[in-house]
Amino acid sequence: VLSGSDKNNVKGVFGKIGGHAEEYGAETLERMFATYPQTKTYFPHFDLQHGSAQVKAHGKKVAAALVEAANHIDDISGALSKLSDLHAQKLRVDPVNFKLLGQCFLVVVAIHHPSVLTPEVHASLDKFLCAVGNVLTAKYR
């Protein structure tokens, strides 16, 4: 459960990310594909090379979902309901991949904003990313 402090920390991070969300989304995917090659299996039709238009486009979608969740932090499940349906009913992505994506997003934030990612903010952002992953997999059951 996200505390009031956690919510403020998450909003602060997304405030710093600002106009870089799409870039960070693509960078997160590239990092995930490189670090966890098994995640590539969900994208057999993608050009997964650095700078790929397909990775950038999907990174934009990932970033938009995270921004949407942060903007509706008191109702993440409502904000991501359609995306949850898509992942549960059509895409059937293994739930562990959301954790891997979250780890990679944390690394990207740390690279670009090292002073922002204090231990407290890191913990809050990790809790938020876990909450997003839980919402995206809630309808699998």
Swiss-Prot record:
GO terms for cellular component: blood microparticle; haptoglobin-hemoglobin complex; hemoglobin complex. One of its GO terms (biological process) is hydrogen peroxide catabolic process. PROSITE patterns: GLOBIN. GO terms for molecular function: haptoglobin binding; heme binding; iron ion binding; organic acid binding; oxygen binding; oxygen carrier activity; peroxidase activity. O2 binds at H58. Pfam families: Globin. Keywords: Heme, Iron, Metal-binding, Oxygen transport, Transport. Residues 1-141 form the Globin domain. It comes from the Eukaryota. Involved in oxygen transport from the lung to the various peripheral tissues. Belongs to the globin family. PANTHER family: HEMOGLOBIN FAMILY MEMBER, HEMOGLOBIN SUBUNIT ALPHA. This is Hemoglobin subunit alpha-1. It comes from Stercorarius maccormicki. The lineage of its organism: Eukaryota, Metazoa, Chordata, Craniata, Vertebrata.
